[in-house]
């Protein structure tokens, strides 16, 4: 189950653990609740889709 909350975060609930994704133009991050670990991943590690 996932939804975007009022702050623009993408909330994904998996087996009772909520993942909050934070996406910007250069990186994507997510933290789990609980526990709230913040993980930031640069977007350039993902291959860009062909245009």
UniProtKB/Swiss-Prot annotation:
Induction: Expressed in the late phase of the viral replicative cycle.
Disulfides per UniProt: none
UniProt subcellular location: Virion
Keywords carried by this UniProt record: Glycoprotein, Late protein, Virion
Any one annotated GO CC term: virion component
Highest taxon listed in the record's lineage: Viruses
Glycosylation sites: 11
Family named by the database record: Belongs to the asfivirus I177L family.
Protein name: Protein I177L
Annotated source species: African swine fever virus (isolate Pig/Kenya/KEN-50/1950)
């Amino acid at each position: 189950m996932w939804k975007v909350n009022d702050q623009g975060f993408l909330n994904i609930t998996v087996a009772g653990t909520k993942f909050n994704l934070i996406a910007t133009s250069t990186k994507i991050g997510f933290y789990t609740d609980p526990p709230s670990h913040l993980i930031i991943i640069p977007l350039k590690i993902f291959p860009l889709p062909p245009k």
